[in-house]
Amino acid sequence: MMTNWNFNKANKPLLLVVSGPSGVGKDAVLARMKERKLPLAYIVTTTTRTKREKETEGVDYNFIRPAEFQQLIGQNELLEWANVYGNFYGVPKAPIRQALAHGFDVIVKVDVQGAASIKKIVPNAVFIFLMPPDMDELTRRLEHRLTESPESLKRRLATAPLEIEKLPDFDYVVVNPEGEIDNAVSEIMSIISAEHCRINPRSIEL
């Protein structure tokens, strides 16, 4: 029997990947986390799509030209990238490495396709699926967003059930009903706390 010990819990930084279907509220949840000044490093996705009216360069996305995006691919400077609905999205590696080196938990927001790509490269990341309570609410959110053409809306609604089928590939699920963002944020922070209490902590290598 061990009667004397000196236990120091390892505090290895985490790479958290938040994903879910379009319209589930990924941007809104992360924005609320930033408002609450939670101690996380938020990685800004790079994209070639057009900036929406209320989006801010360098905050919501890094908006670049397709030629610049292709250059990043050629330099192997993207953790993952994908063509989503005709636009390119990618996660830059450099800020992730820097944040992890300084001991910060890193949070990345990607679509479901992107999460699958990251899991192949960094299987020890923490994968969180943000889930709508039902399809009707997801449809209402996309319609009220007023940023989608009829064709784009139809495509996103058709894709959502296929994305939700990927739920078993994730570690955790957080349901995000309309008007309950703070609950979703609290659940994500609980996941982070639990991960830091693991007997065998995750080790992230890029």
From Swiss-Prot:
One of its GO terms (molecular function) is ATP binding. Its EC number is 2.7.4.8. It is found in: Cytoplasm. ATP binds at G20, P21, S22, G23, V24, G25, K26, D27. SMART domains: GuKc. It catalyses: GMP + ATP = GDP + ADP. Belongs to the guanylate kinase family. PANTHER family: GUANYLATE KINASE, GUANYLATE KINASE-RELATED. This is Guanylate kinase. It comes from Dehalococcoides mccartyi (strain ATCC BAA-2266 / KCTC 15142 / 195) (Dehalococcoides ethenogenes (strain 195)).
